[in-house]
Amino acid sequence: MNSKLSLPGKNLKMQKRRWKPTRMMLTRAHYRVDGQLCQHWRTNWQTSRGSLQIWCQVKKWVKSLLTRLGLSRMITSRRDQAFDMEMSLM
């Protein structure tokens, strides 16, 4: 029997770990001419531009609905302002 096979007790630490979502996603991996592995990473935010645009449309619709109903809009947070700024640059 191969001595390098892992025993069940050694994998206990790995079994306790849970998958956590990352902020980066591997979009492409290939080998260069010199044989080195080249990996292209992209933030999850960039990979979901379609859903991001849908979210912006919904957000604008809700804001306009609140305005038409005469309700005062809540003060937008700095995060929302940065988000709107990012969408205007696209």
UniProtKB/Swiss-Prot annotation:
Query: What is the organism field in this record?
Result: Tula orthohantavirus (TULV)
A GO cellular component annotation here is: host cell nucleus
Q: Which cysteine pairs are joined by S-S bonds?
A: none
User: Which taxonomic lineage does the organism of this UniProt entry have?
Assistant: Viruses, Riboviria, Orthornavirae, Negarnaviricota, Polyploviricotina
Superkingdom of the source?
Viruses
- The protein's name in its UniProt record: Non-structural protein NS-S
Which coarse location class applies to the principal site listed for this UniProt protein? host cell
Instruction: Please share what else the UniProt entry notes about this protein.
Output: Expressed from the S segment by a leaky scanning mechanism. The sequence shown is that of isolate Tula/Moravia/5302Ma/94. The isolate Tula/Moravia/5302Ma/94 that contains the full length NSs survives for more consequent passages than the isolate Tula/Moravia/5302v/95, which contains a truncated NSs protein.
Describe the task this protein carries out. Antagonizes host type-I IFN signaling pathway.
Keywords annotated in UniProt:
Host cytoplasm, Host nucleus, Host-virus interaction, Inhibition of host innate immune response by virus, Inhibition of host RLR pathway by virus, Viral immunoevasion
